[in-house]
Design a protein with these regions (language model features):
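Long, contiguous internal "core" modules enriched in hydrophobic/ aromatic residues
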Residues: 1-327
Length: 327
């Protein structure tokens, strides 16, 4: 199997210069040494020339850089993305805890061990696989989680509120997907998603009543969360598509794209909406807005549209955002 040969720092600088990137050499040396050529290549790929005959669905860029590309701007894009990941991860953490709490409240309303009962969940939910994954997390947590160890020694079983503390967002999202549709709608409404089903066509209504759209959005946010947790590139990431038909009937979410959303703007808008319900007065939307203004808009060769942002993005992200109290 052939692989690309490794290159020295001097060779990397020469490659970038020959392909048309303007170099601040001391800065470039520092970044290539600290961050690596390969990691940065994911950011300067967006600065490579896109041929006129490129496939719009799977465009392949040329090696040559767009005129005006500088290492300084690529480093600025990297820094913006790093700050964006930090902010997004913070927001998703709050959403994860809130979703876990609401799902847990529904599950334990009659029995603390109801999560073990497959009849509680919708047809098609792989309860056995989900429960096996949860038990695996419990076993791994015994050595470090005092509550898990206590319940293992004293009772031999675990109420959901104890189990919940070892679940990650993907576990909770999958569990939410497994709930009956009426439970999903109830939890979704708790987050402020008051869908006007009367504005949906018959096919869209059926889809909405079969499964709440928040399920797919949580799936998308799980992907976003994992991107952030693994320090991967976020700003122009294509995500698991989430339907927008039902949520676009909510005035504060009307700027979502038609049909479905697979770019970052939709995820950020839904996050801002949920966080205003979870933490009234949250400054998260304004922090996001400020970051875009201070760090992204100074990048002369990048466009906010790459992340799926519409013209009215600022008003939409900050809708009903009155308080500046930090939380």
């Amino acid at each position: 199997m052939e692989v690309k040969p490794s290159t020295t720092l001097e060779q990397q600088l020469n490659i970038l210069s020959e392909r048309g990137m303007k170099l601040d050499e001391p800065l470039a040396r520092q970044w290539l040494t600290s961050v690596s050529y390969y990691r940065l290549s994911g950011y300067w790929y967006a600065y490579r020339v896109l041929p006129e005959d490129a496939n719009p669905k799977q465009p392949v860029r040329l090696d040559q850089f767009v005129e005006g590309t500088s290492f300084t701007e690529v480093a600025g894009l990297y820094e913006f993305d790093r700050k964006l990941r930090t902010l997004v991860h913070d927001g998703i953490e709050r959403i994860e805890v809130a979703l876990r709490t609401r799902v847990g409240e529904w599950i334990v309303q009659n029995d603390a061990l109801a999560y073990c009962n497959p009849s509680l969940f919708r047809e098609g939910f792989d309860h056995v696989a989900w429960l096996a994954k949860v038990y695996g997390r419990i076993v791994r947590a015994r050595s470090s989680n005092a509550a898990i160890l206590h319940y293992a020694n004293e009772y031999g079983h675990y109420p959901f509120w104890v189990v919940a503390e070892v679940l990650d967002f993907s576990d909770v999202s999958l569990l939410f997907d497994g709930l009956p549709a009426d439970a999903q709608h109830s939890i979704s409404t708790d987050f402020g998603f008051d869908v006007d089903a009367g504005k949906l066509n018959s096919k869209q209504k059926k889809s909405y009543h079969d499964k709440d759209p928040l399920v797919r959005w949580c799936e998308q946010l799980t992907v976003v969360r994992n991107v952030c947790a693994h320090h991967a590139r976020l700003f122009n990431r294509h995500l698991t598509p989430a339907s927008t038909n039902a949520f676009r009937t909510i005035p504060a979410l009307s700027s979502l794209p038609d049909g479905q959303s697979d770019k970052l703007y939709g995820a950020l808008l839904v996050m801002a909406f949920m966080l205003r319900t979870i933490s009234p007065g949250t400054t998260w939307p304004s922090k996001l807005t400020k970051l875009i203004h201070t760090d992204f808009e100074k990048l002369s060769l990048r466009s906010i549209a790459e992340m799926g942002f519409p013209d009215n993005w600022e008003d939409s992200l900050n809708a009903s955002h009155k308080s500046e109290s930090s939380i």
